[in-house]
Amino acid sequence: MEIPFGGAKGALAIDPRKWEITELEQITRRFTQELAKRDLISPSQNVPAPDMGTGEREMAWIADEYRRLNPTDLNAWACVTGKPLGKGGIAGRTEATGRGVQYALQEFFRHEKDVAKSGLTATLADKRI
């Protein structure tokens, strides 16, 4: 399929609820510095996206720090997805994963043989996902 994204994950083993916002920003920026130092973040490779415990705010901090570290990179803001609209984000990003699941399920139920193999009936009625 040659899809240009996917495959890498990174994390910090912290509980963000236990830190002040200013501390979280410092931690996130330092994490970005460490990723950059190891050439593990750029608009053309290892593009982070929000996940558990992160969102638009953290993605904006990462993008801003990456841009600060790479002032000549014209595509610096593209080093992460999931930024707020005001920082180059895309409308609908928050809903994108759920929408992808919706489309995948619709496509799955179009193929009766696959539905039969799965042991499901041809509808989502009364099912939990």
Residue ranges and their predicted role:
Residues F108-A125:
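Inter-helical turn/loop segments and adjacent helix faces that build the functional surface
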Residues M1-A96, G100-A104, F108-H111:
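N-terminal ligand-binding/catalytic initiation module
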Residues K127-I129:
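Conserved class I S-adenosyl-L-methionine
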